Amino acid sequence: MPTAHQELGVFGEQKVVQKCACPKCKRSRTLVRLPTNFKCADVICDFCGYLGQVKAARVKDITKIPKAVLGAAWKPQKERMDAAIYFPLFLVLASENLKQHAIYYLAADLQKPELFRPRSPLSKNARRAGWQGFIYETDQARNSFVRLF
């Protein structure tokens, strides 16, 4: 049974593939979801191979980007950053009941290391002890996001 956060993630990915054209080749309906737990990417264009990350958050006002959004695993993100590889970000903001949503886009070339803040590793008593995630400090790039829908 998926958690509320997992359901929100699927919701965000579904909205991106339903509504967004590929930012690289500009074709409609070519973005498809990648398998769950694919590292650092959630969608791929089945025409040109473009990869993108999707993050979703519940907010009170879908017109305002929150100051921070939960990311994913820190280690693979850090390894890619060290290699100067960044994936474009689709940020899906949804109302509490998911009736309203907005999709924002942040291009890879507008991302800087300051956008990513590592979280503290999970405690030794946690189910996934030692796992470390990160937070997108969206305040660092607020003016670079473009609203698509």
Which stretches of residues belong to each language-model region?
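Nucleic-acid endonuclease domains
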Residues: 1-51, 55-149
